[in-house]
């Protein structure tokens, strides 16, 4: 948390751009490794490979780079998670819709990677793991948190992994 606060101070003083940090290969690679390992453990713990996840990224650039890492790097011999990148400027509306259907109904997508889309009004009961890489506030935060609280099978609620220190909101 001290490192996070120090970085925030540097960003506020305009000594460094936040994008430089959160889109840096080393940062995104560590994020990818953590999420991959955590998500596999989560599914194993709950004995349910149908559970889905969502990563809310800090920037569109971070989302694109994270998606690239998910599609090119295999962690510890695990079969790669199937991910979909949902951004307004990537793919057309029909393609994004097919990815969302793949997540919600067909279970052909394990993890959605988003920046500004699907934070409100997205209803997918199998979404049980939410990774916050970005601070959201007020109504948007509340809406995003409720994405994981739909009943699904034996799961009454979902879980949040907070990389952005949302409790400050």
Identify the role of each PLM range.
Residues 45-50, 76-81, 153-156:
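Short helix-terminating capping/connector loops at secondary-structure junctions
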Residues 1-50:
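Interdomain helical connector at the RecA1-RecA2 junction of SF1/SF2 helicase-like NTPases
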Residues 32, 52-54, 111:
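Residue-level preference for the first positions of well-ordered beta-strands
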Residues 58-89:
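Conserved helicase motor "Helicase C" RecA-like lobe of SF1/SF2 P-loop NTPases
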Residues 49-59:
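Conserved RecA-like ASCE P-loop NTPase motor core of nucleic-acid helicases/translocases
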Residues 82-169:
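Conserved RecA-like P-loop NTPase helicase motor core
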